[in-house]
Each structure stands twice: as structure tokens, then as C-alpha cells.
Regions:
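Cell-wall glycan-active module
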Residues: 1-195, 290-324
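Amphipathic alpha-helical interaction segments
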Residues: 121, 125, 209-212, 257, ...
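Amphipathic alpha-helical interaction surfaces
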Residues: 129-132, 136, 199, 213-216, ...
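Short, solvent-exposed loop/turn and secondary-structure capping segments
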Residues: 221-224, 288-289
């Protein structure tokens, strides 16, 4: 994308139908204060740590805490049905995922390599638990009461965001024709988010949350059924106005264009208005802001979201298209 001055035009409608999050639902993780029905807002950045990865009173089915190197959850690991065991499994998984992300950032190479297996498997299990709770509100309510106090808001935010997006999903019938691929490295994406923030003043966590919801950080590469394209799902007409001569399929260009569009639509002064212009759904706006809020509270939530996988909702149930 050219580094010429931004083309700022009046905000224009942009109904994408979310190739990943709505038509082929790609759903998130995270958490902070407020009730499930609360309107989300972008909180100030702060440093929040997750609960320590101590041993809970019960373990997820199939997991034993004695051998951490060997007890990573399988991709299809059973999810406990009892709220107490479910809360224990979620608490333990969150702590272990935090530690795995710290190890990855300290000893791995998030700027070049893929996420290590512990991060991928723990994140997938956590994502699956949140999806289960989003589809079962009564179970979710009982589970919240069994969680440590410092995890309740985090769980509630994640479940609420996923439920919001599921409410917008249109089940796919027939053959699934969705192109998926591996995302760019986590820290390479983070550099692009921060570059866009510096240029347009739109917080990088909001941009990351939009990309999470739209295409699971670029994993979904198919156009939406209405023709929205690229990692940030732009309609061609909107791209012409805000793309600044860049490539709609290039991640860095698409993030700059998204920041340009959101800035022209009211961000950072009014993120709700700007996001509603990006996609005309209050549920969408709430979900994006909940995810952004979680990343602002703890950057490790960004790395956890980065490893969330793509799900498609079909008339016969849901299918996971990416991951192990």
C-alpha cells in the first residue's frame, strides 16, 4: 500500500456478512467485568494476569495433572458436563495456556514461526469450552458460579462474544467451499496492527478484534457471498475509497485501510459508531469490543485469540476447518 495521505471520504455502508464469523462462524476467547448483557466498551490498557496454573479439584476428562508434558488435550478432548468439573477444566486450561504463551514469547519466535503445540492445543480446548458454554446458557450460568472470582468476567466476556456472533450465523448447506490457509506470524501481524494504530489513531486491539471476527487473523481467504474480500473483508467499492491504492488481499494494506475506514467513521472517539459502520449489527459491535477489551487487559489474550480455529456452521452441525 502506498504511504500517501489517507483518502478520507464520508463513511459508506459496508455489509460484509463476515465470511468467517457469520457465514462460516469463526468465534473468539477472553474476559473482563460486566454482565452478559452489558454493552461492551474499550477499556484503558492495563496489566492483568490470569490465575496461576495450579491443580484444580477435578481435571478435564482425559487429562491428568501429574505429567504436564504429556497431558495436552487432544483436538477432540471431551468437555465435562458437570459445571464444577467444567469450571475446574477451564481454570486449569487458562493457567496452562498463559504459561505456554509466556514460554513461546520468551524462548520461541512469534515473529517468524508458528505457534507451538502446547499453545495450539490448549487454546483450541479453551475455545471449544467457550463455544459449548455459548450454546448452553443454563450451563454457562452455573459454571460462572464455580469459577475463581478473577476468571468470571473473562469467561463471561468470551461466552457473550461467541454467542453474539453465533446469533448472526447463517448455516451453510451443501459442499463447504471456503478457502483457508495459515495466518502470518503472530508478531508480524502485531507489527502491522501497531503501524495502523500509529497512522490513524485506531487502537491496535480493536483492529485485531475485527480481524479475529472477520477471518480469524487471515485464515479465511474466500470472498463472502456478497463479494467482500481480503483479510479484513472489504467490499470493492469501499476498498476503492479507503484502500489508498493498496492490495485488498495484502494483510498490511488491508489493516491500514480498515484503520482509515474506522477513523473516518468515528474512531477513536466513538468506536461503537465506527464499528457499526464497518458492519451493521450491534451484536457484531459488542463482540468486537469484548475481544478488544480482553486484549487490552492482557496481551496474552491476543496470542490466545491468534490460535483460535475456524469453524463453519452447517445445516447438519458445526465443523472445524483449521487446526490439528
Amino acid at each position: 500500500m502506498n504511504d500517501q495521505p489517507a483518502v478520507i471520504s464520508p463513511p459508506m455502508p459496508r455489509r460484509t456478512m463476515l465470511a468467517a464469523a457469520l457465514a462460516a462462524v469463526v468465534v473468539p476467547l477472553s474476559g473482563c467485568g460486566g454482565s452478559a448483557g452489558e454493552a461492551a466498551s474499550v477499556a484503558p490498557r492495563e496489566s492483568v494476569t490470569l490465575p496461576a496454573s495450579g491443580r484444580p479439584s477435578a481435571s478435564p476428562e482425559g487429562l491428568t495433572p501429574e505429567s504436564p508434558a504429556q497431558d495436552l488435550p487432544a483436538p477432540d478432548e471431551a468437555i465435562p458436563k458437570d459445571p464444577k468439573r467444567l469450571a475446574d477444566a477451564l481454570t486449569r486450561t487458562a493457567g496452562r495456556l498463559r504459561d505456554a504463551i509466556d514460554d513461546w514469547r520468551r524462548t520461541g519466535d512469534p515473529a517468524k514461526g508458528e505457534a507451538p503445540e502446547p499453545v495450539v492445543l490448549l487454546s483450541l480446548y479453551e475455545q471449544r469450552v467457550y463455544r459449548h458454554l455459548a450454546r448452553n446458557p443454563a450451563v454457562a450460568s452455573r459454571t460462572y458460579g464455580k469459577l475463581p472470582k478473577d476468571m468470571v468476567a473473562r469467561a463471561r466476556d468470551n461466552v457473550t462474544a461467541i454467542r453474539d456472533l453465533l446469533s448472526l450465523a447463517h448455516p451453510v448447506s451443501g459442499p463447504i467451499k471456503i478457502k483457508v490457509e495459515s495466518p502470518e506470524p503472530a508478531d508480524a501481524l502485531l507489527a502491522d496492527f501497531r503501524r495502523a494504530e500509529r497512522r490513524f489513531g485506531v487502537e491496535w486491539e480493536v483492529l485485531a478484534a475485527v480481524m479475529l471476527v472477520e477471518t480469524k487473523f487471515g485464515r479465511v481467504r474466500s470472498p463472502s457471498y456478497v463479494g467482500a474480500r481480503g483479510p479484513m473483508q472489504f467490499m470493492p467499492g469501499t476498498w476503492k475509497a479507503y484502500g489508498m491504492g493498496g492490495d485488498i488481499d495484502d494483510t498490511g494494506d488491508a489493516l491500514l485501510a480498515a484503520a482509515n475506514y474506522l477513523h473516518a467513521s468515528g474512531a477513536p472517539g466513538d468506536y461503537r459508531r465506527a464499528l457499526y459502520a464497518y458492519n451493521h449489527s450491534q451484536a457484531y459491535v459488542d463482540a468486537v469490543l469484548l475481544h478488544a477489551r480482553q486484549m487490552k487487559r492482557d496481551i496474552r489474550n491476543y496470542y490466545a485469540y491468534y490460535t483460535w480455529q475456524v469453524y463453519v456452521i452447517t445445516t447438519k452441525g458445526e465443523r472445524r476447518l483449521t487446526g490439528p
